[in-house]
Amino acid sequence: MKNLKQPIVAIAVLSIISGSPIRAQAQDDVIFKAMKDEMDRSMKELKIKGHEAPYFISYTVKDKDIVRIAGSFGAIDSKNIERDRDLNVELRVGDYDLDNTRFSDGGLFGMLMGGRMARGENITVDDDYKVLRQSLWSETDDAYKDAIEKLEAKKAFLQQNTVKDRPADFSKEKQVTLVEQPSRVMCDETKWSNTVRQLSAVYKDYPKVDQSIVMFGLDTLNRWFINSEGTKTFSARPEYVLLATASARAEDGYVVCDSEIFVGRSESDFPTVPEMEKRLRAMGDRLTESIKAPLIEDYDGPILFEGEAGGEFFSQTIGQNFGNPIDPLGGGLAAMMGSTNPLKDKFGQRVLPTFISVVDDPAATDYKGTKLFGGMSIDHEGVKPEKLTLIDKGILKTFCSTRTPSRYVKQSNGHSRYGLASTTNLFVTTDATTSKEELYKKLRELGKQEGLKSVLVVRRIQNMFTSVLDPKSILMGMMGSMRKRSGFNLLPASLVYRIDVETGAETIARITPFNGVGLNTLRDIVAVGDDSTAYPILLPTTSQGDALSIVAPSVLVKEMDTQKADKNMEKAPILPNPYFEQKAAK
């Protein structure tokens, strides 16, 4: 087993998924007072001669308590316990129709996916009014100077270029006041260090598992937000995450990766340590068996994504692409990135079978006794979230939106997380469920129609965290999706079974990465199961946000294909792990 430095990347990624708490705060505390006073002064007095004054300012202060503990093979690899506070300033010059945002001058960092990248700066963690005012003043000054430069460049671009159907740059929304109770969590660092040691030691019993990492994270976020329109919000939430990832390498060099994710708003949401250990051992068993299985390459036929794999299938395809597609003006890398959404230009068209709908419900808290984690009472722009029917009987009806309008959605529906539009609790629903027995029967029938001797059932799919252990397979999957027009990226499978079309007998297998998922593939979904289940989803699109949830059934896809085998895979280590060599010698 390798004690990797790479998993530290995963710790950084895990940091992206949470938030953190602070000390007890009143509605009119020193932070709100400093924000309000500096905003009032800026709206009244901030102006450079010959240029417009700001028409809109918002301030966000996030106070975060962060605990990170990572371990492997029964030992702690890293530990990080910190508190920080940062300030984000959004300042707009011009008016709601035309301002300094949504313009790319060719660089990535001023524009991200057609939206705006929030300005951020670490500030004092002390509730010192004068120091807070100084930080607010300095950041506001920088934001204003940048805004007037961007607006001038944008106006020059519009004079030289014809832009048809340009939407407004900012939507007008209702003033909101919402103040929640502060979040305050005391972490038992010794307890969780021992838990990480115990759980990571599981893989001392699995010689074929050559890489593994167990990470615990507790983020507690308290968030202050005000804007010049009069909106004022305070939101708070803790989030616990325990993530275990592991991999094993087959003799042909292909790596099989898997993970287990546990998410909670409190320790009581977690399973017991013995229950988590049982699941980690099951993962070790799966990996050990999988690398012995034959590799199936260049497969073209039906695939059943069963159970949790069904949730990942929907999450990684349509789920990550419900953000309102924004077309930035200008050019360069940012403009190119802003047009990559496969659902773009499919508004009002069929993207799924007519028996499938997709709903996003920010107010949902549980599904059949399983807690959901994506809900929020207010979004990050101070807009109350709406329940959305994103896809109705297969037809794409709307997108999750922020206050940045698009050609499709003109108003915010309260789905902003750190400036990006995001889902919350996603429900894949159907009025035509199919039993497990019927799904398998249809799968075999489809295989026979294609002249196949066997078909595939995928029961687990990799997620973004397993890329730390197997970056090459992730890259191969991305290349596969790029080769497909309007393709979605689907990460490689972690657990696959081959089903004999005649007898129904199943044997464990491995497959090469998928060649992406095209819109035609989604439209040709044959059936979904009656087994809808809730799963926590940690998406990169949440930027710095929280865990989300998806409720989805198993799904039978009529036709998918996988790549040809890569003949240049890295081989297994020449010498065995010394731990297992010494253990065998005893």
Tell what function each PLM region has.
Residues 9-19:
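Bacterial N-terminal signal peptides
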Residues 22-381, 392-395, 515-521, 526-529, ...:
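Active-site bordering "gate/hinge" segments
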Residues 381-586:
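Long, low-charge, small-residue-enriched segments that form tightly packed helices used
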Residues 1-6:
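Positively charged n-region of N-terminal signal peptides that target proteins for export
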Residues 8-9, 39:
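N-terminal, helix-rich and Lys/Arg-enriched segments in bacterial and organellar proteins
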Residues 13, 22, 233, 256, ...:
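Polar low-complexity intrinsically disordered regions enriched in Ser/Thr and small residues
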